């Protein structure tokens, strides 16, 4: 009998949406909004390839959604990266078909490491904040890619 793993057909992740191309960044910014009108689920990957700064410096990466490309709501706040943190990947899912059964307050950002999975919109963007407490040019290299389903 053959190995059952040989017959597994991988499921495609979906259309790739670049929310933040891989680059070294030294300051916070908003990424470019990407239309997600025909999407009901987003698989979002944060790929941090380098953090070259002091331990007290931080990187916070967010994914925001918008119904109108004007009002932005924070849906994902990835786990905070220390300035001397190791390279790594973080993954989160937003699913419009699973909105949940409770009201979600969205007047402020989610806490670090929190996903608001039912929060969805016609537009999506990445956003990041870099704290440089040592004043010596904190630098983090990362990308954010969403796979639209």
Which positions does each model-derived feature cover?
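Surface-exposed, low-hydrophobicity beta-strand/loop segments enriched in small/polar/acidic residues
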Residues: 1-149
């Amino acid at each position: 009998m053959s190995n059952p793993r040989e017959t597994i057909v991988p499921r495609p992740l979906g259309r790739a949406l670049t929310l933040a191309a891989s680059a070294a960044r030294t300051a916070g910014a908003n990424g470019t909004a990407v239309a997600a009108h025909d999407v009901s689920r987003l698989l979002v990957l944060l790929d941090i390839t380098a953090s070259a700064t002091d331990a007290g410096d931080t990187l916070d990466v967010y994914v925001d959604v918008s119904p109108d490309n004007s009002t932005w709501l924070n849906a994902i706040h990835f786990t905070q990266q220390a300035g001397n943190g190791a390279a790594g990947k973080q993954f989160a899912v937003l699913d419009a078909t699973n909105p949940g059964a409770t009201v979600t307050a969205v007047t402020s950002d989610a806490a670090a490491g929190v996903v608001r999975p039912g929060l969805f919109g016609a537009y999506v963007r990445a956003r990041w904040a870099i704290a440089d407490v040592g004043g010596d040019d904190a630098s983090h290299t990362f990308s954010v890619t969403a796979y639209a389903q």
